[in-house]
């Protein structure tokens, strides 16, 4: 069992992406460097920051960075622990997200997930590769997960 959120959990998601190249080929290649920020849901917890590199049909890098570090990414998906945990639990319960828990829905109004980017073209990469990101997170259905903020 892996704990969400943790480096090991996200590395497993990357490994699953790499094992399922054929599924990702359906959406076309994705060359993008991005980050995911887990914002604390209470003052007792600290933020977590993870960096991902997608090259063609694979995840070539997953790193945990210190919060506040310049992640050198195209964009960062920012949301609270509660938002991320609810999305992952929904994906696991339904073998994929219901309409209210898809990345498209959760980012549509910049709430509850905000897409932080330095410019519009970088932010647009999320939309361009949106199906790839959703399929990446759908890999959570194959991870036995313990949720701990």
How would you describe each model-predicted region?
Residues 1-149:
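Feature captures hydrophobic
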């Amino acid at each position: 069992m892996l704990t969400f959120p943790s480096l090991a959990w996200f590395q497993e998601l990357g490994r699953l992406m790499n094992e399922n190249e054929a599924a990702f080929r359906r959406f076309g290649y994705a060359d993008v460097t991005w980050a995911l920020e887990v914002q604390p849901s209470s003052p007792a917890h600290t933020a977590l920051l993870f960096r991902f590199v997608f090259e063609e049909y694979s995840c070539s890098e997953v790193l945990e960075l210190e919060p506040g570090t310049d992640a050198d990414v195209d964009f960062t998906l920012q949301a609270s622990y509660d938002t991320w945990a609810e999305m992952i639990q929904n994906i696991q319960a339904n073998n994929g997200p219901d309409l209210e828990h898809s990345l498209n829905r959760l980012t549509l109004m910049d709430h509850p997930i905000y897409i932080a980017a330095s410019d519009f073209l970088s932010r647009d990469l999320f939309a361009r590769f949106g199906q790839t990101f959703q399929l990446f997170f759908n890999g959570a259905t194959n991870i036995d997960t313990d949720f701990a903020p």
